[in-house]
């Protein structure tokens, strides 16, 4: 086998094609995808490699192409608490959008993972200039945030379910009075 056929077999898609084909960005227009490509770099992570750490500066976001990433919380616990596992087609790292730009979770590759990384500083500038880009990203990232919040909520309830009292938090709730009738 000569070197030309080897290069053909392992040919990698151009970054612009990878951005355009990522499911998270489906339906975005050509101009928006071009701006996103301008902010993007390809990244690869080994199994068990920490990608980002909770509490550190959020400098961008990731779109997973292959592999799996565990999102974990370390805040207030002796060990990391798994929140959610994301894989191909998913986004993680939405904290770049909102001051103070601090990661809300730790992300760790569970297996070898390829992702597109988008630099926040450049992207925020583009979003300020092109509000349609900012709005498209906000709509998509908001949906991810809701899912992530629900996953964190469910996980915390699961962890603390044995400690949660089934009794009301206040021993005697105040009674509402309507005339002489107590409701």
Residue ranges and their predicted role:
Residues 1-183:
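Cytosolic regulatory regions built on CNB/CRP/Popeye-like sensor folds
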